[in-house]
Amino acid sequence: TQRNRIPICDELCQRLPSTGLILEIASGSGEHGVTFQKRFPTLTWQCSDPDPEHCRSIDSWIRHEQLSPKMPAALQLDVRDANWQDQLSMPAQAVVAINLLHISAWECTLALLRQSAQLLQAGGKLCVYGPFCVDGQHVSESNHCFDASLRARNPAWGVRDQTTVLHQASEAGFAVQTITLMPANNRMITWIR
């Protein structure tokens, strides 16, 4: 988590709007979220996670970093939930998902694309970070081994195919804006609604 924060911040700096609400899906412990809120003080960073323990951790990080009331309390939100907008205090300008696609079932990827498309207005952005294979081929031996270890832990998990995800995003109403190669064989894909 710690080693990729700065490269992710640097990339998001080029992709996100300068003001408004950013919804982070599957925020985990909240370490990324508080880092992003501090890096982007003109944005409101809204963390979310389906796990109540993670939400408590996020809220603890917000208090520890003294980011309240600028940074709102975590939302207990599962990516598969409908009507994300009903839980938000204001419309979102972007949705961010970091290390979600490979440690969740394929249905979560589809839900992320579908629900983000419903939530975002024209011009809204979806930024997804993590490992991808390309046209069914792993981009490195380490990604191949990582994929095998994920699937051994849970057969529904695994490194997703970039081409397949791009197709599903297009079907949901997104146009790819950038695909950026990131450290440790990861990628940041940014779509625009």
What is each stretch, according to the model?
Residues 139-163:
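Conserved Class I S-adenosyl-L-methionine
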Residues 96:
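A conserved beta-strand element that flanks and buttresses the S-adenosyl-L-methionine
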Residues 26:
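Conserved S-adenosyl-L-methionine
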Residues 123-132:
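Conserved beta-strand signature within the Rossmann-like core of class I S-adenosyl-L-methionine
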Residues 174-193:
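Core SAM-dependent methyltransferase catalytic element
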Residues 103-116:
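A short, conserved alpha-helix within the catalytic core of class I
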Residues 23, 31-83:
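Class I SAM-dependent methyltransferase SAM/SAH-binding core
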Residues 2-19:
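Conserved alpha-helix/loop element of class I SAM-dependent methyltransferases that forms part
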